[in-house]
Structure formats: C-alpha cells, structure tokens
C-alpha cells in the first residue's frame, strides 16, 4: 500500500515527544466528550455486546497496561506480558462491570496523565528505536500512538457506528485522520473494524448508512473501503 499523500493528506513520517503529548491531551478531551454524549444511556450489556461504560473500562485497562510496560522498559525492569488477550479482556470486563462511569472516567484520565509523564522519561532518539521490548517491531513512537490514540479512537468510532451517531463519528474521524495515516504510513487498513465487530450484520448495515450520509467524502469512502464495503452504495 503506497502512502496516501495524494488522496488522504498523509504527510507526516514521525512524531516527537511534544507531539505525542499533544495527541494524548486531545484524546483526553474526546473521551470526556464521548462519555458526556452517552451518560444517559441505559443499555444493559454483556461481554459480547458492550455499552459505552464497558468501552471506557476496556480503554482504562489497556492504557494502564501500556503505561506500566513503558515504565518498566525505561527503568530496565521485567514486566509480565499478556499471555491471552481474550482472557485479559474478559477478566477486566468482569472486574469493572459494576463500577460507576464517574470512577472509570476519573481513573482513565489519571492514567493518561501518568502516561504522559512516562513518555517524558524517553528521549527523541528512543522514539525511533525498534529494538525495545514493546512486543512490536516498529518504532517506539508508533507503539505509544497505537495504545493512546489508534486503539482508543477505533473503539470510540466503532461504538459511534454501533449506535448510529454518525455526526460525532465524522467529527472524530476527521480530527484524527492525519495521525491515523501517520501511524499507518498511509495505509487505509488502519480503519478496519475487523477486530472490533460484535454483530457483523448490524455493523454492515450501519456503516453503509454512514456511507450514504457522507457519500461524497473521501475520508469516509476510505473507511468503507478499509472495511470491504463498496463506496458506490
């Protein structure tokens, strides 16, 4: 897949510590806005059908894990990797199921602020390293952006599609479009919801509906293409 300079505005090739901090500040605001949009939601959930509170709890656990890993790496300490992601996610779902959204929000914002402090322990040269034990073969800055921006935003975007909140989906997608393509080197597959889908039939119906509302928008067309949906709907 070639970089998306021509069609999608992809320009940036790397990120600095200051830029990563700025992106984390942005996601903090958008998480709070997301919670505000769904605070009155009364949806009863289960592990295969999350509500907005489950999404926030999931993000909290992953930000905490990523932060602890980076803290261990910078101090040359051992850390325990996740051996089974499904078990990790399910255990945390059960642990947080009855926690109030106010508590979850407070903890998540705290962890994101702690994450920024950990980022500051690294150097600009460290950000370009691919040999650190993150569990991935790409640069450290890409790992940080994956865990603090890409993964959280994709969960928010999926939930917005799931609940047909297309206006907020478009706004959020637009806001993070450049950073998504920077992270993914212009590859539209960064917008694939394959690993997030709960109900594939409903997802396809809703994302096609999204496409109908924004049929002339190149960014939304790319999202549809990444999810194997014909843009000419």
Briefly describe each language-model feature range.
Residues 12, 89-105, 133-143:
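Acidic/His metal-coordination segments adjacent to aromatic residues that form catalytic metal sites
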Residues 20-23, 27-31, 62, 66, ...:
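Alpha-helical packing segments of well-folded alpha/beta enzyme cores
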């Amino acid at each position: 897949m070639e970089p998306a300079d021509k069609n999608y505005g992809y320009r940036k090739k790397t990120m600095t510590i200051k830029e990563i901090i700025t992106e984390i500040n942005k996601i903090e605001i958008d998480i709070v806005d997301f919670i505000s949009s769904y605070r009155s939601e009364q949806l009863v959930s289960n592990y295969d059908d999350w509500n907005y509170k489950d999404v926030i709890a999931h993000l909290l656990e992953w930000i905490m894990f990523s932060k602890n890993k980076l803290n261990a790496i910078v101090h040359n300490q051992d850390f325990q990797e996740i051996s089974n992601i499904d078990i990790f996610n399910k255990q945390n779902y059960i642990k947080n199921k009855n926690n109030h959204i106010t508590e979850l929000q407070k903890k998540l914002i705290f962890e994101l602020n702690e994450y920024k402090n950990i980022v500051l322990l690294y150097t600009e040269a460290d950000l370009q390293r691919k040999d650190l034990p993150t569990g991935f073969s790409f640069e450290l800055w890409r790992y940080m952006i994956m865990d603090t921006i890409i993964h959280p935003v994709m969960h928010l975007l999926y939930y917005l599609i799931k609940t047909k909140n297309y206006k907020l989906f478009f706004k959020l997608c637009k806001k993070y479009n450049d950073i998504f393509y920077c992270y993914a080197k212009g590859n539209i597959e960064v917008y694939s919801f394959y690993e997030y889908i709960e109900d594939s039939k409903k997802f396809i119906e809703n994302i096609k509906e999204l496409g109908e509302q924004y049929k002339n928008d190149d960014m939304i067309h790319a999202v549809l293409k990444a999810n194997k949906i014909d843009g000419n709907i």
